[in-house]
């Protein structure tokens, strides 16, 4: 039984939208094969996304004090997203989050400057903001861990193991 049949059996209908994440670039024949198969099954909303780690890019937060930009001493906030083009964005899935103490911030791991994920959209109607929010949500789906989040979304992280 293929994945579409399993989904239809469980949900009694096919999904309206399919998003595929992978770590390597999509080749033209992959795009054609995936989109043709899904369209034949009646699925028209298809997004094909690559997610890679950009280890060489590091940013720290800045704050404005006395009219000047100063280093904040902390990494950028988790969820920071910089759109590079209509197809590419940088997303920080690891970074500062609000603490339960109102005057503090929490940085999981407490050291090193986090590197962003590079999101590249190869195909589909989905906007990068929605895609980035979905990827960020998938970083909170590792139920085998007590961590607040993982650096990689579950769609990529589980394929690494």
What are these regions (language model features)?
Residues 1-161:
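Long, contiguous domain-sized segments
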């Amino acid at each position: 039984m293929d994945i579409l049949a399993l989904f239809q059996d469980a949900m009694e209908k096919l999904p309206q939208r399919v998003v595929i994440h992978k770590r390597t670039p999509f080749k033209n024949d992959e795009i054609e094969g995936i989109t043709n198969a899904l369209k034949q099954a009646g699925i028209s909303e298809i997004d094909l996304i690559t997610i890679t780690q950009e280890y060489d890019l590091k940013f720290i937060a800045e704050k404005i004090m006395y009219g000047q930009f100063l280093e904040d001493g902390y990494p950028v906030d988790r969820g920071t997203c910089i759109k590079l083009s209509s197809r590419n964005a940088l997303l920080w899935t690891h970074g500062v989050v609000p603490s339960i103490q109102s005057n503090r911030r929490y940085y999981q791991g407490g050291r090193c400057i986090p590197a962003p994920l590079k999101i590249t959209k190869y195909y589909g109607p989905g906007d990068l903001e929605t895609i980035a929010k979905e990827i960020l949500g998938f970083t909170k789906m590792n139920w085998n861990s007590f961590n607040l989040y993982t650096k990689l979304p579950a769609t990529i992280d589980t394929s690494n193991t």
